[in-house]
């Protein structure tokens, strides 16, 4: 998670074309989401709520996939074809 945040900060320091986000920004968004969901999963595990723990872990997979898909469709993440 920390690596995601460091990568996001480092990725945002380099110049990029207007209207495009680098993969580093994606990793920063996902790093924040993963930190929040990991805290939620730990809190639910401490409370002994197995269903909420499974739900939090499921979101750890779903959120990055949805955000990446939306960013990819809006062409904000550059691909090999754009080069």
UniProtKB/Swiss-Prot annotation:
Protein location: Cell membrane
Residues spanning the membrane: 23-43, 49-69
Keywords of this entry: Cell membrane, Membrane, Transmembrane, Transmembrane helix
Chief location category: membrane
One GO term describing the cellular component: plasma membrane
Lipid bilayer topology: Multi-pass membrane protein
Record protein name field: Uncharacterized protein Mb2101c
Organism this protein belongs to: Mycobacterium bovis (strain ATCC BAA-935 / AF2122/97)
């Amino acid at each position: 998670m920390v690596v995601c945040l460091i990568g996001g900060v480092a990725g945002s320091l380099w110049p990029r074309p207007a209207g495009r986000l680098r993969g580093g920004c994606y990793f920063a968004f996902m790093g924040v989401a993963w930190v929040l969901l990991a805290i939620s999963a730990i809190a639910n595990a401490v409370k002994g709520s197995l269903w909420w723990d499974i739900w939090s872990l499921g979101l750890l997979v779903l959120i990055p996939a949805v955000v990446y898909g939306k960013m990819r469709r809006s062409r904000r993440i550059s691909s090999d074809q754009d080069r």
